[in-house]
């Protein structure tokens, strides 16, 4: 079979991108073909895989929902020009045969958190339309779901039948999760690299997508610690996102000097060995 794999943004430290790559590799290992369509690509190119980048210069000046619509228009044209047995999406968009559902239900979160008037905005309408194009009752898209809880949330709002969901097990790579052998030596090396005292309490925040993962709450929690505990504490933030607003928040909370933004890194087991 020949698959079209569709993903807005690929970057190596994203959990979604890692899942995308594992599924792509498995399809190829089983003898299938796959062509990849992305808006942006960061990191090393994939061997033996055609990757088409559909980004536009206007994306740098656009809101996310406008970027998504522009990507989808370009993707639709590419899909018309080529013949695929199945279109597999890792973000919500129309026209998918299979959707890998790693994301939360947009309208559930928005309707609980924001004023009803915001439902009239172009942003809300776009994300609702794209979500409905996957989960609507008149759609045939098959959904690979990572969470029984989130599946029920989608069904509450879209009444999607059970028959369209397949629940997947946790996507943990056991090779990457093996503990380091020399924990004490690794601990010492990591702390020396970042100038963190050996008796400091080292806290770790690991995850790309700081808003979704709740980095603001982690910073507020650090700032709320009892003074004697806070004095000993340092926080490492490991993940790929725009840190500016969170660096500002850390400074406003008086803990800016205690927070280290490391960006995305491949040495998570080593960092875990150093953390408390």
PLM regions: where:
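Nucleotide-sugar donor-binding and catalytic loop/hinge architecture
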Residues: 1, 181-202, 227-228
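N-terminal strand-loop element at the rim of the active site
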Residues: 7-13, 26-63, 78, 150, ...
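A conserved mid-protein helix/loop that constitutes part of the nucleotide-sugar donor-binding site
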Residues: 17-22, 201, 205-224, 244-245
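Glycosyltransferase donor-sugar binding loop
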Residues: 41, 206-210, 232-247
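An amphipathic, basic-hydrophobic alpha-helix
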Residues: 60-87, 125-133
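Nucleotide-activated donor-binding/catalytic signature segment of Leloir-type glycosyltransferases, i.e.
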Residues: 246-265
